[in-house]
From Swiss-Prot:
It is found in: Mitochondrion matrix. GO terms for molecular function: aldehyde dehydrogenase (NAD+) activity. ALDHs play a major role in the detoxification of alcohol-derived acetaldehyde. They are involved in the metabolism of corticosteroids, biogenic amines, neurotransmitters, and lipid peroxidation. It comes from the Eukaryota. This is Aldehyde dehydrogenase X, mitochondrial. GO terms for biological process: ethanol catabolic process. Homotetramer. Belongs to the aldehyde dehydrogenase family.
Length: 517
């Protein structure tokens, strides 16, 4: 989804500036062992009921890494049953002190930190993202998000209300119950943490379906959940496909809430399934076509760099990617030249090499989808300025691609490509670019680059997006809410707002013989 709070990490001079040099990063494990390939239900490793398995593929080579259990509806039923039992009144989990839930989450964070190199290596192997980003960005965020919500566990509570009459009134923030969670493949461990941490901090139990493209790191984290001491049934991890296992979670009558991160198209299906079943609570973090707007007074070098990383970070596989770059007419030509040169300099290659900036797309389907959009952009009349083809002969690599002369009615201007393709647009006036930026079904993020504070503040109010960045991009921390307007989803993850999605507010009113202030 995004680049976390490490704004200098991906700078021109040092992509590993949080460490003194690339040499300061630990060496990756090039062939990590794969100890877990079964479903994790009730703190036990189990085969799928059907005994089916499916392959997980190394996108760097296109070769099969191994096979994992293919869970489906029957396995979801088993997992939901375990989660419901763990959530019953009087269970060890329900009777556990909130501070103890926080201690378990902190313990989990410690275990992730202990195994950080292994987990980062596993993420790079299965997902294809550069190891230095897996280690320095993703794992850093994972550890922080578990610790952040651990701190909230005994601080998220109700309040007393001075209501009229002879009554004493207070509210309780209670866990919703069994939470179904469906996570994507672009940030497997991060998305797992974004969803697990607030759910567990507030006392829920979880049935999680992980992406079929990237199951390995999530399964290993399940082993750490057991090692940390979470009771059986509190967390259950299912590997399988969306139309079977994912749909079973969304439709399940004994799942109280579903949280999904992924495409807007699937988000519609999740919302419908929730409505057609038991009206379960729904949180959706979906797609985007986010604008980056560069005004003529912007710091040119900085804006070029930020807009480049806004799009190309994580191989363009971010829902909040800055996938529409609007540049004021008077600086458009210079910005375009610098942007093309920067894209040509981006190092594509083996993600285990510490100076690699761009790895492969996650799988063959995404690889072909992105190449299809590149061909479509050329057919529609956009000018291909660099890239536009595969890189190398093995794996799913695509050269960084920049289009100029893009028009708003082109499909590459309207649809989420989810790959390393940067379309550039020209604009003349502020009101014009605001209208064009907002003319989209999406509303996840936006950015504006300017030295004029008044203009910056005006844009932050005018842009229809859940997050607006000024003179930066992709800066997200566990402390700040993240989510979208319009068809980019509903609800928020992270921060204090992220806790609201996992609790019900109960009002308790007691008649008293006499009320005194």
């Amino acid at each position: 989804m995004l680049r976390f709070l490490a704004p200098r990490l991906l700078s021109l001079q040092g992509r590993t500036a949080r460490y003194s040099s690339a040499a300061a990063l630990p060496s990756p494990i090039l062939n990590p062992d794969i100890p877990y390939n079964q479903l994790f239900i009730n703190n036990e490793w189990q085969d799928a009921v059907s005994k089916k398995t499916f392959p997980t593929v190394n996108p760097t080579t296109g070769e099969v890494i191994g096979h994992v259990a293919e869970g489906d509806r029957a396995d979801v039923d088993r997992a939901v049953k375990a989660a419901r039992e763990a959530f019953r009144l009087g269970s060890p989990w329900r009777r556990m002190d909130a501070s103890e839930r926080g201690r378990l989450l902190n313990c989990l964070a410690d275990l992730v930190e202990r195994d950080r190199v292994y987990l980062a290596s596993l993420e790079t192997l299965d997902n294809g993202k550069p190891f230095q980003e897996s280690y320095a960005l993703d794992l850093d965020e994972v550890i922080k998000v578990y610790r952040y919500f651990a701190g909230w566990a005994d601080k998220w509570h109700g309040k007393t209300i001075p209501m009229d009459g002879q009554h004493f009134c207070f509210t309780r923030h209670e866990p919703i119950g069994v939470c179904g969670q469906i996570i994507p493949w672009n940030f497997p461990l991060v998305m797992q943490g974004w969803k697990l941490a607030p759910a567990l901090a507030t006392g829920n139990t979880v049935v999680m379906k992980v992406a079929e493209q990237t199951p390995l790191s999530a399964l290993y984290l399940a082993s750490l959940i057991k090692e940390a001491g979470f009771p059986p049934g509190v967390v259950n991890i299912i590997t399988g496909y969306g139309p079977t296992a994912g749909a079973a979670i969304a439709q399940h009558m004994d799942v109280d809430k579903v949280a999904f991160t992924g495409s807007t198209e699937v988000g519609h299906l999740i919302q419908k399934a929730a409505g057609d079943s038991n009206l379960k609570r729904v949180t959706l973090e979906l797609g985007g076509k986010s604008p980056s707007i560069v005004l003529a007074d912007a710091d040119m070098e900085h804006a070029v760099e930020q807009c480049h990383e806004a799009l190309f970070f994580n191989m363009g596989q971010c829902c909040c990617a800055g996938s529409r770059t609007f540049v004021e007419e008077s600086i458009y030509n210079e910005f375009l030249e610098r942007t093309v040169e920067k894209a040509k300099q981006r190092k594509v290659g083996n993600p285990f090499e510490l100076d690699t900036q761009q790895g492969p797309q996650v799988d063959k389907e995404q690889f072909e989808r992105v190449l299809g959009y590149i061909q479509l952009g050329q057919k529609e009349g956009a000018k291909l300025l660099c890239g536009g083809e595969r890189f190398g002969e093995r794996g799913f690599f695509i050269k960084p691609t920049v289009f100029g002369g893009v028009q708003d009615d082109m499909r590459i201007a309207k649809e989420e490509i989810f790959g390393p393709v940067q379309p550039l647009f020209k604009f003349k006036k502020m009101e014009e670019v605001i209208e064009r930026a907002n003319t989209t079904r999406y509303g996840l993020a936006a950015a504006v680059f300017t030295r004029d504070l008044d203009k910056a503040m005006y844009f932050t109010q005018a842009l229809q997006a859940g997050t607006v960045w000024v003179n930066t991009y992709n800066i997200v921390t566990c402390h700040t809410p993240f989510g979208g307007f319009k068809e980019s989803g509903n609800g928020r993850e992270l921060g204090e707002d992220g806790l609201k999605a996992y609790t019900e507010v109960k009002t308790v009113t007691i008649k008293v013989p006499q009320k005194n202030s």
